[in-house]
């Protein structure tokens, strides 16, 4: 006989099949070991490289503090989740085994128990039917059992997919968004069962895999279930660690010193504490519900119930176990309802944002009742888990006294659903019968809360009101007093300037002007009539010339070129916003690459400009489109800039980058960057460095992912003390935001920020990025913001006081457009503080439209250099402006200004115009221009023969008590997009002028004997009556 199964005389060492199985097991074990080793290497490489990157930026302590908190949260959460579920599974299996042992004992006793059976005159021992443990619930037959198991499995799969999906979202942020902070994950709800596969996108494979694992784990039982439990525990650990900042903010919360009018908590309670409780509730719900479903499924599938076609019923011990888990789920439901009480402060009902009359008098009390009722259910189930359930009818056991009928077991669920139904129906009835007939009276106190909270949350309460008549009389003397304002009126919009730059200044295909930004510089100027040199503020457009590697010819896109040669952009253009060169092209203060004296210098318009604008060697290693990593100081020189038909090469000598000075470091960087050519190239030297994460938007988001960032970084050229190589710096604004400010209305957003998801914002941080070295500095500018104060407490080494910013860079800070647009949009409604006016929307404003390149668009905020009237301003300053018109009319009603210079930074000024007088709005001015027969005829002539006229941004410029309207007109060929400034239209009072330059147009209006030969001056008297009738 063979000595073992599978062995025989022909196969003394085992059959080939067994050998193959053993070899396959060996390969599987080897693959598992290899996978673990690769994952471990990836983790080590990531931590090692990230540590070096943060160390390079002097933020190493920030990195390790995050790692410690994230690691601790992940380990604690994962261990608690794993331990809890494993304990529940072990208890379940023990109860199943005990039931099986009792049944086996009953069968054994039945076999040997003598039962007297009479056969004739003798008694024979016959086996009696086995009497096992009595079930405490009715048995389930296959037609009921199978659908029940399928439904529970689907819910379990959906739960796993849900948490995997939201965890992937947390850990894969979109760095193109202004805010990458993840939203608070909502607790799992059954409706996700029907939406599991919608919106998955690229994560569909991962989530489907998680669902398959859940299904296989349930179907195959204990073998795969521990692996699934481990994966889900890791998912929960990652989910909570991805929300690490919520715990830190809760621990380091700062008071707002403002009390909400309903629950009388400080606002900090809603912004710092509630999100943490919502996060924990989401985790607890998933943990307890998964345990409940898993335990129930294990019991239902025990004793081969599916193959037998019958489940005998739950035992008393099993029902106690399920009751305990049900109590935990009910407890989380009670916590959710308790937290939802606070959600009414953020409800949007149309008339009132926040809790309204119906919420306070009906929905809120019912929500409190639901919370108490859910907790009562939890207590009841907890009591049953200790005392046990009564045995159900139909189980073969006698009915016990006081036993609840079967309907009584479902009564709490029915009552809970009935309360939910009454909450909705009662709210609808109260709204219809009580509120709507007397809405203003009922909602008055809640409208007051809404107005006050929104103005506070968006910082509208700091706006200083002022009145502008718009009826002042400008004279040549007053124009001369405001000469600096006139010299800085913007004639060049960023779009046509960029088009011109791309035609004339890109120089090579691989250079790109991705953006042009408005700023101001102090330049040296010489008066025409004297040799006196003075300084003056000049508004400019600056456009960096960055390197776009994707534009390199495809055949030249090699690994060496991508990472060693094409490493940086070079230079910028600087154009005054008001000057025009020959042929209507932009006038440049700074342009080109290379001069007769220095091949690497940028060409300036004059020596005075060269001494006013720091240029140096303007290499851009860190920018808005520098998306690839590079290695510097290699054996291959870097392309520096083109010179004629040849190229000039250079080696990087800045502070940026991490040394690749050891084989281990090369290996870890190769793993991190997934670039194995780094290991085999022979071009590296001992002082070779790697520069990665060079996109400034990705760079700052990786350091401070908890901030919201402005979408328009702008380049500044400045000389900073102690910096020899760097003259180019990026300035970026950052915000602290929250969506948890009670009664504050976030609005619907605007063209720049559709779907706004915050209802509190402060411009608290200015960020400085060195375009050459990559250094990053965060400066706090708002000491009154509790959110930034909390982050300063968490990361004191990350933030610097604004006073420490170099003075040459302070002169270039500006009030950000994103912040200003948000406040401007909120001011459309929330300038109305009178409750009756607010309710009726009697004074609702809107942002007017303008025609730009034949398309209608809202007038965007624009920067000006001007002297603000009515506030005793001593000199012109850099301001940001937005115009308003009434909701149903087109006349001008208000102008909002934000002051940008350091000494007045952040102050807002709102000029309102008299409602009883007609003051032309931008849409009316455009209508006047377009309907004037002479001007419209000229524009029609330009729109022929392969060209088109483009009406640029219309600017409304207050000068003393008067308003000046200026609109540039560009001429652009349809085939070759090279816009030129063709004419400038100026409107003042009852006259409209169109000339080749701004000075000529102004002169044509104010000088009775203008020198401009081509100026067109037209009266507006013929159209005033039409516009007046529009107001009536």
Swiss-Prot record:
GO terms for cellular component: plasma membrane. It is found in: Cell membrane. This is UPF0182 protein sll1060. The keyword NADP does not apply. Signal peptide: none annotated. It is a multi-pass membrane protein. InterPro entries: UPF0182. It comes from the Bacteria. Belongs to the UPF0182 family.
